Amino acid sequence: MASTATQRIPVARGRSSEAAGHLRVTASEWFASGARRPYDPIAKTMLETVRGEGPPWPLHVFEKVVATPPVGSGTRWLTMLPGYPDGSYGFAQVDRHLGPAPGPRLYVEYLGQGDSDKPKDYRYSSVERADLIQAQWRAHGVRRTMVVAFDYSSLALLELLRRQQERDAAGEEPGATIDAAFIVNGGLFADSHSHPWDTTPMLKTPVGRVGMWFGQHVPGVLEATLRAAKLFSPSYEVSAAELADLGEAILRRNGAAFMHRAAGFVDEHRRNADRWDLAAIVRELGDTVAVHIAGSEEDPFEPRQITAARERLGPLGVDIQWFPGGHLTTSEHPGLLADAIRGLARAHGVGQPISHPSPTTGETTR
């Protein structure tokens, strides 16, 4: 059982990331390395081909798979769930540090983000994001997986863990099973959110809606918004190229409006406080799921979450870590985050065969 003390991850002096240098993965390179696939959010399933039902369904979602085919049905996967507002591109520098292993790994892109479609009249929520994740697991024949959840993806993960607990309790077929979870800079407890008022809380207001219209249509507005958004630590000298790529990932397919439309995720967490009680989920799942938590020392969005985690999860043996820097560990310290992911993936058997694999109806992953 892990110590209740929080482990601090050391960092070398100077900028830990080559994000401003020539090794940085650009947004266009990232999206070119994945694919858009048709998805039916009503049936909650990935489609082999577009069936031609007409608008607005089906929609298309971006995904990126890192794997050496063929991937056997008895292989444990690594699933990467993105943050808000940068989506899967937020993992681009981490992915570069990871290289081909651990794998197979699946990067999910939610509707509204990155190169996925951005439907206007759509009820964005953590629940529908969980539906998409499960649909992608079925499509790829994923039976067991470790999950890395960054930022607001913690809420989709909490919904997935609760569904898993409910299936286990009812004795139902498990489908894809989460063996381990690593939550980084995410919301853990509904009563511990502390976002600065001029960030996510402002974005969900009419002022935020208007601001994102200007962000989409007026050059330079979104980059200025991101620079002022407290995403980085004061000591991190974010480059113009980094901001431009973050902006490109967010603006893609008219995506700035998603920052307003999806900004109510804290309210959603509070409405589902009992269902998404992480301490209760950890107790009820017991030793069937290993849970690891990490925060950042200079994160202004969720500083109270790690304090609450030490009090509520530490006694349950949950591993808790501190990264240096600000909220976007993915940008400031991608190498440190990649090292942590690699170590946990190794410990939890990512890429290794599962004992007694059963036949799967999922497709063979490319």
Positions of predicted regions on the chain:
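Residue-level recognition of oxygen-bearing side chains
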Residues: 86, 93, 336
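Hydrophobic residues on the short alpha-helix immediately C-terminal to a glycine-rich phosphate/catalytic loop
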Residues: 94, 160, 340-344
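Flexible "cap/lid" subdomain of the alpha/beta-hydrolase fold that forms the substrate-access gate
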Residues: 5-50, 61-77, 85, 89-90, ...
